[in-house]
């Protein structure tokens, strides 16, 4: 459970997380040592104590326990138990819903962030070209997926890529009727529709790209659908 605390009274954010991950904050952030807090493993999966009791102690030690505190209530890893615990431990604080607050701030990218996203765009373009060149009737879907992964991670001669937040989504045939399936070990068939939803990633900055392919002869229904989409665009 790794999170950040941003306070108007502090020059830097505060990182907190599991003890074994504390050094990751030292290696990958600019934070000073006094802004990195790592809790011990007895907080993990313990019904008698919770990591946010530790977080409450951090806020108390920094004089933030009586402030207005906005929490990201729709974050994937900020559970109802986290919210209940922090409210119980900080009775003098005022809690507000900070839904999407950080995302709104991060909409405006720095020049460096834009550079990273452009590099991710080159990586995903290469990965998509690999998929286009390799997908064919009789080719196994899993072999294409392996080549796509290689392109995503190997990146370019100048810089490499990283794992993406989600696996390549590349269903074929009837499986395209639901968008979030990926490959199987079956081979591509004549007439298959193939959805490709890929991503390039450079230093955790993503650039997604989606394309649709038809193998062999498309049915009239698919042709009509394509014409309608083109007209709409």
Kindly give the residue locations of the regions a language model identified:
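Active-site neighborhoods and metal-handling regions in enzymes and metal-associated proteins
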Residues: 1-233
């Amino acid at each position: 459970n790794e999170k950040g605390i941003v306070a108007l009274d502090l020059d830097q954010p505060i990182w907190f997380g599991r003890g074994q991950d504390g050094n990751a904050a030292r290696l990958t952030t600019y934070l000073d040592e006094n802004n990195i807090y790592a809790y011990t493993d007895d907080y993990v999966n313990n019904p008698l104590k919770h990591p946010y009791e530790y977080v409450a102690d951090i806020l108390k030690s920094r004089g933030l326990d009586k402030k207005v505190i906005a929490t990201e209530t729709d974050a994937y890893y900020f559970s109802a138990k986290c919210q209940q615990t922090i409210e119980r431990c900080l009775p003098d604080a005022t809690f507000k819903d900070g839904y999407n607050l950080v995302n709104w701030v991060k909409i405006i990218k720095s020049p460096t962030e834009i550079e990273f996203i452009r590099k991710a765009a080159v990586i995903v373009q290469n990965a998509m070209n690999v998929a286009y060149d390799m997908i064919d009737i009789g080719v196994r879907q899993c072999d294409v997926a392996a080549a796509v992964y290689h392109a995503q991670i190997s990146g370019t001669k100048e810089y490499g890529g990283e794992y993406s937040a989600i696996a390549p989504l590349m269903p074929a045939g009837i499986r395209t009727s639901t968008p979030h399936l990926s490959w199987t070990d079956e081979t591509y068939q004549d007439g298959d529709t193939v959805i490709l939803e890929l991503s390039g990633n450079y230093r955790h900055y993503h650039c997604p790209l989606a394309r649709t392919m038809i193998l062999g002869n498309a049915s009239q229904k698919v042709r009509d659908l394509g014409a309608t989409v083109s007209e709409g665009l």
